[in-house]
Amino acid sequence: MAILKGGVDGPISGLVGTVVCYKLGDNNIMRSRMRPRSKNSWSESQVLHRKRISCVGSFWKSLAKNPVRASWRAAAGLWPGYSLFLKTNLAAFSADGSQIDLEYLHLSTGRLPLPHQLTASVSGGNHLVWKATWLNDSDKGLAKLNDELLVMVVQDGKFSPLLSTGAKRGDQWASIQLPGEERTVQGIYLSFASGDKSSYSMDQFFAAG
């Protein structure tokens, strides 16, 4: 059943035949209703695809309390952050979703550019200390001198919260001290955020080697 909100001239909300109507921000959205299907009607590739999407969804839920979610909400605008996360990261998951390619995975996204020639590597053989360098391009586009360098750590298959390094884009380098145990560090994701945290960049992964 559909409801007319605001009288006969108002938007429709609900189900009209096989069409679902709803409001998203200032936009009125119409989409086809999904038809129920029996369990045995799915092909093998469809079953795998559903498992893959389910795994992406589970990964997204694991970031529920992680500050990095703010980057997806900011970039997605009116749409749910998960929709953009799924579109961006589906290719990083294996066919059945059981494996993740860390180099293809993105934990942060947004309009801010990453600086040119961003590099990061373990410093002095200690996997808990990294050195990052980049070129200062704060005179171009949205980039600003006070954009903050952020890091997420992958340790033993687990992802840390989004952490501040204390470094700014204008510094052109940073020494990053990671939490946790050295032997479990698989790599780090580096990204930038504006000073007021209203804009973020997509991140880049660096393996510990």
For each feature predicted by the language model, list its residue ranges:
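Long, polar/Ser/Thr-enriched low-complexity segments
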Residues: 1-115
